[in-house]
């Protein structure tokens, strides 16, 4: 990794930490991050020319794999007509129609430029719509870096939240309640204490930022019931799960209808795009139809919209999501079987084409506390072994993995063979 090491050293001169998003710095696992030069199908290629089987997939959106030729050509064609207009286009109307067709709960939607913009705007809308200030989120869920969301639980279950980053005033954090994921009783208790104050619940319907943790039976329905009872807005943050765990997202997989949904770069074919949308009567409160302000010069960018249309029209292919789910199950269960056979405690979670590997003897990880108690030393050793042998996983034990349509059965089996070799080394070191 000689060239990557040189680039990383050079990057730290003018880029804080040498990266433009913290997890890329490899602080959680140690070592030097490979600097990527190109990507194609299931593969990444670093600056030193090494090929990796990629299970990060740009943190989720590359459902079709990298450098999809139809998306690439759509971008080229759109770019020939100009890169940005700052004006309405037919493409943004067409993609809004298509998203609404595929995710029926999104009766109206607004394009933005990132998942953070989507969640930030959805929360502002929920507050404006309900005329309430408090929001409820869950420990271990990540919804972007907006001030109101970088908040952790206080000293007691129902105490005011406290900032999880410097630069966030305590006055902002006090309006955020943080509950335990998959614990509906804590949510009910919060609403009983603040029945007229909570504007919304925001939740990852499948948590993807404490590794991959699906909802336990009844959890999402419980959130729907509580919001209905107290007049709060239920927001599904489907930035990771949208068009990933099912064609209609997690809400289709689990048959729960939220009031608002947030989507990320998956609807831009991997380009910088986001969207939020939902019930018509709520969305009509957004400017210029209503009083809740939201805007963006680059929102609905014509090149990104072209990429998104090319992507969404392909993921409609019958059978795609069944194939993705089967490949993901084969991979996750295969790695678990190898680990357990070598005497390494491991459990796995998966939902659609998202998966999580947990070095723990807990049979099924369902919350943040269980996730953070996993064996990070074993994970880090496993991570570097896989990386050295050409498999690129997320460089932190708290991040989900993703399978794409380009991960063929042969590539899955190749990955399992590499995992067997690496896990044998883990067993030897920690046995």
Curated annotation (Swiss-Prot):
Reaction equations catalysed: (S)-4-amino-5-oxopentanoate = 5-aminolevulinate
Keywords, alphabetical: Cytoplasm, Isomerase, Porphyrin biosynthesis, Pyridoxal phosphate
GO cellular-component term (any): cytoplasm
Pfam family, one: Aminotran_3
EC number: 5.4.3.8
Keyword NADP appears in the UniProt entry: no
ATP-binding among keywords: no
Enzyme class: isomerase
GO biological process terms, semicolon-separated: protoporphyrinogen IX biosynthetic process
Subcellular location: Cytoplasm
GO molecular function: glutamate-1-semialdehyde 2,1-aminomutase activity; pyridoxal phosphate binding; transaminase activity
Chief location bin: cytoplasm
Gene3D superfamilies xref list: Aspartate Aminotransferase, domain 1 (3.90.1150.10), Type I PLP-dependent aspartate aminotransferase-like (Major domain) (3.40.640.10)
Pathway participation: Porphyrin-containing compound metabolism; protoporphyrin-IX biosynthesis; 5-aminolevulinate from L-glutamyl-tRNA(Glu): step 2/2
Family note: Belongs to the class-III pyridoxal-phosphate-dependent aminotransferase family. HemL subfamily.
Subunit structure, interactors included: Homodimer.
Protein name per Swiss-Prot or TrEMBL: Glutamate-1-semialdehyde 2,1-aminomutase
Organism: Pseudoalteromonas atlantica (strain T6c / ATCC BAA-1087)
Lineage: Bacteria, Pseudomonadati, Pseudomonadota, Gammaproteobacteria, Alteromonadales
